[in-house]
Amino acid sequence: MGLIAGVQLSLNNMLKVGDWIEMPSRGIDGIVEEVTLTTIKIRAWNNTLQTIPPYLLISEPFDNWQAMFASGGRRIKRSIMVDISSIAFADDAFIEQLRTHEATRLLMDGVATESLEGIRFTNVDLYMRCVNRFIDKHPRVNHKMLSMVRQLQPTANGLPIEMYFFTADVRWVQHEHLQTEMMSYIMALAPLFNIRIYQAPTTMDLRRYQK
């Protein structure tokens, strides 16, 4: 069985030395170091060496991240939870404030403030459009790939706003740094739109309530 599986892996080009593969069901996550007809050796991220039979990769699903590296884009899929009680219509004074504030002035440039049907937008609508504009204008985002900012199903913890896009740098460390920078900026924008980001009460919050 192992020999046949090794031949199948080779003929179907399912993996090769240097590929990053992941099989959560078996705790496998690392770089392929050696491929033979009877064994596959994988260097895990903690530098331990995992040895598995080829038939394991034929009989069970696994992820090969090499296609992601070749595509030129690495996905960011993050969401923030908006306190639903902070959602409100955006009046003219509020819109003007956003158009003149240093942090939102450029993001608001050209952003519509009401729908084609004449329905006035809320602060969340404007926030999502500005976040989308921020992503669309960012030089380190892969603009050839899908990008969107959307609402998910409301939950007991608030309204999830999801950012979905791809960075142009697929290297792990650089990707994580950019993800941190962009998400921190997106979260810092929220209070300027009078949006409260929900988080579970901390010990300090509970002590404050008790007083």
Where are these regions (language model features)?
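Long, non-transmembrane cytosolic or organellar matrix-exposed soluble domains/tails
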Residues: T100-K211
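Short, structured beta-strand/loop micro-motifs enriched in basic residues and often containing a Trp
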Residues: M1-G6
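Soluble accessory domains appended to multi-pass membrane transport proteins
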Residues: L11-S115, D125
